[in-house]
Every structure is written in C-alpha cells, then in structure tokens.
C-alpha cells in the first residue's frame, strides 16, 4: 500500500482529482440552491478512490452505500440495530472486492489494485484477506473523512465570511487554510487504541487489553 502513496505517486493523482472535482462543480447550478454534501462532498472521494482502484463507475453508488453502512457501526457511539446491517454490508463489499481481485488478476491494468496484487507476488506471506483488509480500510478511512472535511470546511468559512473573503482575494492561502480546517474542524477527533501491557497515567492504572479513546479533537483546541 505504501508504494501507491509515495509523494511522487500522490502528485500524479492531482490532475485526476482536479478533473473529477471540476466535473462535479460544473454540474452544480450557478443561480439556485444545491445540496453541497449530496451533490459534491459525498461523491468526490468515492469517485477518486474508485478511479484509483479501477472500479467501474456504475458501481460507485453501491460501494458508497456499503462504506456508509460499515462506518456507522464503528463509531465510538453507534446506534443500536446497526450491527446486522453493517455485517451484511461488510460481507457484500468483501465479496465484491474479492471478485475484483480475481478479475484484475485475469486482466491486469495500471491501478492501485494492480500494485497491491504485484506486492503480493513479491511477498507471498500476504494473503487475499490481507489485501481485502487494506482495500476496505482505504474505502472506509478515505471517503468518509474527506467528505466530512469538505463539509466542515465549507461550514467554517460560511461562519467566518471574512476568512472566506481572504481566500477569494488570495487563493495562495488555500494550503494553509486546509491545514487549519484539519485542526479547527477535524473530521476525525478520536483515535482508538488497546493497551498491550499495564500502563499508568497520573493516578490511573490501566490494565492490558483495555480499550482507550484518545481525543485528538480536544488536543487540537488545547482545552
């Protein structure tokens, strides 16, 4: 997976991401309200990830639905009754990606999926389940966080119109603005870890096997 996300490889994706972004933006109405989340933010990351993997455009809605269903149940506080739906989505998405692996082995191309398959040839210890786990992680971690960052970032600018005006006057500030959005309105505010050995934090003794939630969102605002 790392070989597909080197700085050089990531830069090569820039044109494709810009093209996908511009295509979606061109479809938005210029003189009437539209749903930014539904018509842009929710579509863009799934399209980019699918393009990276070489997944058929006609399957985008289904892969997004699976990703959404799985993501809902792994939240720190998940609503009851979602587990069965999430488990079914996990099975269906896994089988879909397994079929994609078989298809790509029979008909290789030049995508991230092919890079992973080639990596498996170089390291036979990697099983198909390992590849599928990485593909699932890419979908789950990649599409939801990007969607939420786009939505949170736009909302922050609407709440601070003077900052939006600064960006309009000087687009060169955009890289710094994106970094600040990641801090100020991060789409990921919790990191989960399980202790492997006894640990002590202040007066608190934490035994092995304990699930911890690290609130990075709080650290970003230095409470």
Kindly give the residue locations of the regions a language model identified:
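Cytochrome P450
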Residues: 2-223
């Amino acid at each position: 997976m790392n070989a597909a996300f080197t700085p050089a490889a990531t830069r090569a994706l820039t044109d494709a991401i810009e093209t996908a972004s511009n295509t979606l933006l061109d479809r938005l109405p210029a003189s009437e309200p539209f749903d930014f989340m539904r018509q842009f933010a929710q579509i863009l990351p799934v399209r980019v990830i699918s393009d990276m993997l070489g997944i058929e455009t006609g399957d985008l809605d289904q892969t997004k639905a699976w990703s959404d269903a799985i993501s809902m149940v792994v939240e720190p506080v998940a609503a009851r009754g979602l587990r069965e739906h999430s488990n079914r989505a996990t099975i269906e998405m896994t089988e879909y990606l397994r079929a994609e692996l078989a298809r790509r082995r029979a008909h290789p191309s030049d995508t991230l999926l092919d890079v992973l398959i080639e990596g498996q040839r170089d390291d036979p210890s990697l099983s198909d389940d390992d590849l599928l786990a990485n593909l699932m992680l890419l979908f789950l971690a990649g599409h939801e966080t990007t969607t939420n960052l786009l939505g949170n970032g736009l909302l922050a600018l609407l709440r601070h119109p003077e900052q939006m005006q600064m960006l309009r006057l000087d687009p060169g500030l955009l890289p710094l603005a994106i970094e600040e959005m990641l801090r100020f309105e991060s789409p990921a505010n919790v990191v989960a870890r399980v202790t492997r050995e006894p640990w002590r934090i202040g007066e608190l003794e934490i035994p092995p096997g304990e699930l911890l939630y690290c609130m990075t969102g709080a650290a970003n605002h230095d409470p």
